[in-house]
Amino acid sequence: MEHKRNNILLAGLFFLLLGLVSIARAQIPQWEKCGAFVEPASEELLDPEPRGPVNVEADRVESEKNGVSVFSGEVKFRRRGQWLDADEVLYDKPNDTVEAFGDVRYQDATMDVISDSAKVNLEADIGEAENARYFLRDYHARGEAGAVEREGSVKTELRDATFTTCDIGDNAWQLKADRVSLDHKEGVGWARGARLRLWDTTVFYVPFLRFPIDNRRKSGFLVPSGGSSSNSGIGISTPYYWNIAPNMDATITPRYLSDRGPMMEGEVRYLNPSNFGRIRGSFLPHDAKRDDYRGAFSYRHSGSPRPRWFTNLDLNLVSDDRYFEDFGNSLSIASTTVLNNSLDIGYQGNGWNALGRFQGFQTIDRSIPAFARPYQRLPQFLVDGFFPDRFLGLDVDFHGEVVRFDRDAAPPTGGVRLDFWPTVSLPFRTPGTFFTPSIGVRDTRYFLEDAPPGTDSTLSRTLPIVSMDTGAIFERSLTLWGSDLRQTLEPRAYYLYVPFEDQSAFPVFDSAPLDFYFSRLFQPNRFTGADRLNDANQLTLAVTTRLLQSDTGAELLRASIGQIQFFRDRRVTMPGAAKETDSSSLVIAEVAARLAREWSLRGELRFDPHKKQTDLGAAELHYRGDEGGLLNINYRFRRNFLEQLNVSGRYPIADNWSVVGRWYQSIADGRLLELLGGVEYDSCCWAIRLVGRSYITNIEGDRNNSVLVQLELKGLGNLGQNVERLLERSVLGYGQPF
């Protein structure tokens, strides 16, 4: 009973907030589905400050005494920045006033007004019209008014007025107000005694309302949103958008969740010539479901304080390990286990760059033991350089690193690592071939802190790395499906030699086996980081073929396959792993194709020839139609780890109507990771989206189920939750222009 009473109170509060809202403009609406109200303004009309002589064209002219002239029959009254058309015009030259009658149309830089009659004081630049229709030039908006009072190009007063962004003849939504003030200088409108009408039915009364009349950002309350989920109950949010400056804004969102309590969220964004950033935070003083404080904070900043210098800051904090499960909005966010915190300061030279970094981590998943958590880099210094065509045509490559690792673990571990890796290569190139021999030396040294008794605290490893990379490009012309094409055949061979050195006593600060993809066939180390350098005596053989359009060079198909042949066992491994004895690697194949203008395909296969089985497979099929249709099919398979199918799409079923959905299934264990389905109607001035969603929030399989509804009144605001943003995350290609 108490829960039901809370829901009723929340509903009442939601509609009360609707009545107090001051609509802000944080995003520019799109009007591609709309027709034009009026023709584009001429150059003369775009002058915001009317001036200069008056020019009049008319069928007939009568001059009366006292300087009053009467023009009739298709009168065209022109002054730079102002046009007036009417059946009849009285021009009082001494007082510089104009009276117009019959099919009156007034135009200036900001609006068009059509009325039965009008009076204009040219000297004071003020005027009024009766029984008028008006159209805003800088915004797809129009309306009607019993009276219009114009004060230059700065302000317009409307009595008994309406306001809408819908096309002529369509009043899907409309504001009807006793009085409306349009401030063209600030780009806002003020309505008093306003009623929001949907399809000629008044849905609520607003005693005072501010709304945008152009595309500039405006401070004010955004339309409140409401929704319901099985995780947090019914909730309402009343975001306030603060346009602090042209380069800075903020959104402050008080939020109430019926099952948890009051919550505050906020975001600040800034953009300067030399830097940009975003600060986000949320705060729940007391979560009724957990009887505890909840909160999160993030700050991202990128800058260039001086030429060639750059900075990056990434700070992330969260109150507890379940925060993203309870308040995140996707499976990927809910499964976050570690948060990065880092500060980078770097310099970009001519062919080289340097970076200093401080990096730490917050481990959210407390089930991860201390010895398995990532090391902090306090600090790390990196220098990389590439200097082509130096002495005797040599290319010189250099990588250097000095880093101190630290981690809170028992017993404490850490230390300093120095890693230097210079390489020289001598490339030989012809129009259809290349051959590049290279030789490098990698020197790595450790100065360990709190080393266990009986172990060395100083370790080192110095090894040569020798490689030869060669390939060719063969090309032929052919005709397929009536199109002139070019096909290439690109064989490539890569030999790598690195002698063996026992590295089992070395710590593992940041090294791990590299995942095996096609590009890794040509890399000198099969491990990340510097803690392990592979021993190698191997030859990579690969071939790529492409289909290109003869006239444009556009790539229609690219297919590659490759494998490594090993001439000895690989004895350098990670701790606890056995040496590798296979005489060859897995076979790697990749394909990418543009099947038609709307269709594209990507695929990858990793085959184990020794076990005669597929180790990894992935395929992506994408369709993008001209009428808004989307289809994404993504299949992923990794033996003994995962097998997933992700299907999403958007299908137009009628004019402006579409269905949208996502089915994300774990085939390996039969779990439905996410199911989303909905319908949307999107027209010129309004849209509605209804979506049902269910997704897993944690490894235990707990689910969050929700129904989301969004009514978008374009140019005014959104009622309900931001369904559009959810669909952009869930359906690849949604929201992108066609």
UniProtKB/Swiss-Prot annotation:
Gene3D superfamilies: Lipopolysaccharide (LPS) transport protein A like domain. Residues 1-26 form the signal peptide. Coiled coil: none annotated. GO terms for biological process: Gram-negative-bacterium-type cell outer membrane assembly; lipopolysaccharide transport. It holds the Pfam family LptD_2. GO terms for cellular component: cell outer membrane; transporter complex. It is found in: Cell outer membrane. It comes from the Bacteria. The keyword Manganese does not apply. InterPro entries: LipoPS_assembly_LptD, LptD, LptD_2, LptD_C, OstA-like_N. Keywords: Cell outer membrane, Membrane, Signal. The keyword Membrane applies. Belongs to the LptD family. PANTHER family: LPS-ASSEMBLY PROTEIN (PTHR30189), LPS-ASSEMBLY PROTEIN LPTD (PTHR30189:SF1). Component of the lipopolysaccharide transport and assembly complex. Interacts with LptE and LptA. Together with LptE, is involved in the assembly of lipopolysaccharide (LPS) at the surface of the outer membrane. This is LPS-assembly protein LptD. It comes from Nitrosococcus oceani (strain ATCC 19707 / BCRC 17464 / JCM 30415 / NCIMB 11848 / C-107). The lineage of its organism: Bacteria, Pseudomonadati, Pseudomonadota, Gammaproteobacteria, Chromatiales. The gene is lptD.
